[in-house]
């Protein structure tokens, strides 16, 4: 047997009077843990196991993340009442309790704009009245029927006693219901706050043990003038609060602070819905940690009591485990040093590659402190401008193979997974850089030739099938396999082998920036499956592009290709006119499909003789549609 001398004695006590708090008291091998609720106690127990495992070889804590507390008398409190992270590691039910998060899937009886799921077929009975007509794009929140349906949903699924949270939010549409009852409550055309508030107060009185939240977003952006009951609150979306370094002092900071301060007058329960990913590209690293720390300190200062970090959901996202560990630590204490948290995670999980990973990732974080905005819906070029400096990234990517070979077991698998994901970033940088030093191709006179490495990047990305959650690369569920297929089809086996326009500098009306105008003649197709990939998008239903063709003196085929993607208001043209030195020369008529499922490439060609010509003008016109744009990827002249 084991003598008492060799045992740890641990006493556990839940004390609700400790506000959000926890306490550790140590006396030799006697340890007393006190916490204000189950969630903190669970977290505290895992912290303790991790700490003891460092001193006592009988206890294995290797599968637990680094601990934030020490084995001495200590006390503290969680910065927020509610914290969840919508990312693979943050949604893993085996991990949430360990890192002090609320389990998102269990926390909410109704979430976001999901009220319609609850209403089901009955929704049609509670459609809003907009401009005097029944309108299925929005719901009526003063309807007795709506109240009854939510009431029975709660009684049937959650009972009276539990403490679940429910979001009661209008649909993601700009108009509010203005039926007689809603109008009498105070609704106006774009403000649904009065009716929504009334419903929430009524539900909170009917179910005093549950919590009910409105949102501060679109039609409920306006703060109510009523004091809200203690079991109600608001979720404030930070979508319009730019994601960049903040010191709380610029106009955008003040604007967001004012919104929080106004809600603080009517409720103590203010949750923030903030963002931690680029939703158009989950695979390229997104250095959000230092920015998130500044935002958390700012939110806390202005009364926030809960945080929901919206990430990549169940889809793989580069560095997710490390980022989720750091963010969950900052949600407990926003003052913890970010670099130390990153280091402790890499040191534990990546024994071979820890320094190399730490150096590169913190370099990204420091790049993102330049003050440039991080794009929530960004293509590779925007990421490159903000933080992804190509020379740093390519060096890191090229060194990965050695670390994958050297590492073993779990570390090797994780590095291999990261290498696969970052092959997408390498392909995107290569595609965007065309035939320059970082590009996928080399130029040889009027031809471009893909470099042999490009095939390696693709082969590496194809391994994504071996990893969970790596089927899609963005929120719109764009498939990696489809991306690879288009890459092979349009870039590796391009139909433009040689173009006499290669490298010409076109000018355009409306005016284009230098990078965009070069894209038109870089011999590199865009990928129709993703409008971020290589398309020059020009606003309006007409544009003219002028090419300096003096000295070409040849006849051949004029070639131009367009993106047809009506879903994003990008329309292929109906007509293209060519003018030689200002004189009408040729006309091409096109009949693009109305609604292709995915983006499609539309090509137009016509024989042309440019002997003696100095300027070729291309006049492009599409159907007159609201918000129309024209997407072009390549203009070529094939001898």
Language-model-detected regions and their locations in the chain:
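Catalytic domains of carbohydrate-active enzymes that cleave complex glycans
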Residues: 330-520, 524
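Short, surface-exposed beta-strand/strand-loop-strand elements in extracellular ectodomains
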Residues: 569-582
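Short beta-strand-plus-loop segments that form exposed binding edges in beta-rich domains
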Residues: 618-626
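Short, well-ordered secondary-structure micro-motifs within conserved domains or adaptor modules
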Residues: 2-20
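Disordered, acidic Ser/Thr/Pro-rich linker "stalks" and the adjacent N-terminal cap
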Residues: 488-555, 561-572, 593-598, 627-638
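Structured mid-domain segments that build the active-site/substrate or prosthetic-cofactor binding neighborhood
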Residues: 145-146, 254-355, 359
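Feature activates predominantly on carbohydrate-active enzymes
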Residues: 17-209, 213, 233-236, 260-287
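Extracellular carbohydrate recognition and processing domains
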Residues: 585-608
């Amino acid at each position: 047997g084991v003598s008492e001398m060799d045992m740890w004695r641990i006493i556990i006590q839940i004390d609700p009077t400790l506000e959000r708090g926890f306490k550790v008291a140590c006396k030799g091998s006697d340890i007393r843990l006190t916490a204000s609720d189950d969630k903190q106690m669970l977290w505290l127990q895992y912290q303790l196991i991790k700490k003891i495992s460092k001193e006592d070889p009988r206890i294995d804590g290797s599968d637990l993340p680094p601990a934030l507390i020490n084995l001495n008398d200590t006390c503290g409190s969680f910065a927020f009442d509610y914290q969840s992270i919508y990312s693979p590691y943050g949604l893993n039910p085996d991990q949430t309790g360990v890192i002090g998060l609320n389990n998102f899937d269990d926390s909410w009886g109704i979430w976001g704009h999901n009220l319609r799921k609850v209403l089901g077929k009955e929704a049609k009975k509670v459609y809003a009245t907009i401009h005097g007509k029944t309108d299925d794009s929005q719901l009526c929140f003063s309807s007795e029927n709506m109240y009854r349906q939510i009431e029975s949903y709660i009684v049937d699924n959650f009972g009276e006693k539990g403490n679940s949270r429910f979001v009661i939010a209008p649909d993601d549409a700009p108009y509010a219901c203005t039926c007689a009852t809603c109008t009498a409550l105070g609704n106006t055309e774009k403000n649904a706050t009065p009716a929504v508030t009334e419903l929430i107060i009524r539900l909170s009185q009917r179910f005093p043990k549950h919590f009910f939240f409105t949102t501060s977003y679109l039609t409920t952006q306006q703060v109510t003038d009523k004091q809200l009951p203690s079991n109600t609150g608001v979720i404030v979306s930070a979508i319009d609060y730019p994601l960049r370094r903040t010191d709380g002092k610029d106009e955008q900071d003040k604007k967001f602070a004012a919104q929080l301060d106004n809600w603080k007058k009517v409720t103590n329960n203010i949750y923030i819905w903030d963002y931690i990913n680029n939703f158009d590209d989950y695979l390229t690293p997104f250095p959000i940690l230092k920015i998130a720390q500044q935002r958390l300190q700012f939110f806390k200062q202005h009364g926030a009591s809960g945080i929901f970090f919206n990430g990549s959901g169940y889809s793989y996202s580069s560095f997710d485990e490390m980022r989720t560990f750091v963010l969950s630590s900052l949600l407990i204490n926003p003052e913890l040093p970010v670099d130390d948290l990153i280091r402790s995670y890499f040191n534990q999980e990546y024994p071979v590659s820890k320094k190399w990973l730490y150096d590169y990732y913190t370099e990204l974080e420091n790049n993102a402190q330049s003050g440039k905005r991080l794009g929530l819906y960004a293509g590779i070029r925007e990421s490159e401008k903000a933080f992804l400096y190509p020379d740093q990234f390519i060096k890191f990517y090229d060194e990965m193979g050695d670390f994958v070979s050297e590492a073993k077991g779990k570390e090797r698998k994780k590095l291999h997974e990261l290498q696969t994901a970052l092959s997408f970033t390498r392909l995107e940088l290569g595609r965007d850089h065309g035939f320059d030093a970082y590009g996928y191709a080399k130029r040889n006179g009027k031809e471009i030739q893909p470099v042999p490495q490009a095939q390696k990047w693709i082969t590496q990305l194809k391994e994504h099938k071996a990893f969970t959650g790596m089927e899609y690369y963005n929120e719109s569920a764009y498939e990696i396999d489809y991306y690879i297929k288009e890459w092979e089809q349009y870039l590796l086996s391009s139909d433009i082998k040689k173009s006499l326009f290669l490298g010409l500098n076109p000018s355009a009306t409306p005016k284009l920036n230098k990078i965009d105008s070069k894209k038109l003649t870089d011999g590199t197709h865009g990928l129709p499956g993703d409008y971020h990939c290589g398309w020059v998008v020009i606003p309006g239903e007409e544009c003219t592009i002028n090419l300096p063709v003096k000295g070409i003196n040849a006849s051949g085929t004029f070639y131009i290709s367009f993106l047809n993607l009506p879903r994003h208001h990008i329309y292929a043209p109906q007509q293209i006119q060519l003018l030689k030195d200002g004189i009408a020369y040729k006309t091409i008529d096109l009949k693009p499909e109305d609604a292709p499922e995915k983006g499609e490439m539309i090509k137009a060609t016509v024989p042309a003789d440019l002997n003696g010509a100095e300027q070729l003008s291309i006049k492009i016109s599409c159907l007159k549609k609201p918000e129309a744009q024209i997407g072009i990827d390549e203009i070529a002249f094939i001898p």
